[in-house]
């Protein structure tokens, strides 16, 4: 954390590649959504990766965000009156957000690790988590999402089909198109191409 030195060599290359994945246009969209979803009292961060990290680092804004997606009376994360100043309390607040986001439906592969945000290791992963959360909120369409629905992609939803017993029986008598046909093209009347191979001793 505070006493971690700069990375060199291969570690530096890896960190550089991770930092290049950060999308500044996406940052603007996420900031707009968080402000609309949570209210203007959350403030606005300085532009750029570092400003975005500092804004979200203590976990309070993230907790307010996930709470705003739930109805009153069933908020999953307790938000402290005063933002926590102790490091472990801040990390605990971020961990509570991650747990609530997972309970909301964000899959584990879309989740960032606490250190990704806290140490600024992988802010692109933080963006991915927030995008997944926004997409889920738009898809659920339960009245708690605020903002432009075009900011996030709507996830595909399951469409189960129910068949009656008679429909299932009728389906057994249908010949599928992949089973072929006894009409149409055939080799009747065709002659072989070219002459057969001549083997002379």
Curated annotation (Swiss-Prot):
Coiled coil: none annotated. Pfam families: Calponin (PF00402), CH (PF00307). Calponin-like repeats lie at residues 175-200. GO terms for biological process: epithelial cell differentiation; muscle organ development. It is found in: Cytoplasm. The modification Omega-N-methylarginine is found at residue 183. The modification Phosphoserine is found at residues 166, 181. One of its GO terms (molecular function) is actin binding. Keywords: Acetylation, Actin-binding, Cytoplasm, Methylation, Muscle protein, Phosphoprotein. The modification N6-acetyllysine is found at residue 172. One of its GO terms (cellular component) is cytoplasm. This is Transgelin. It comes from Homo sapiens (Human).
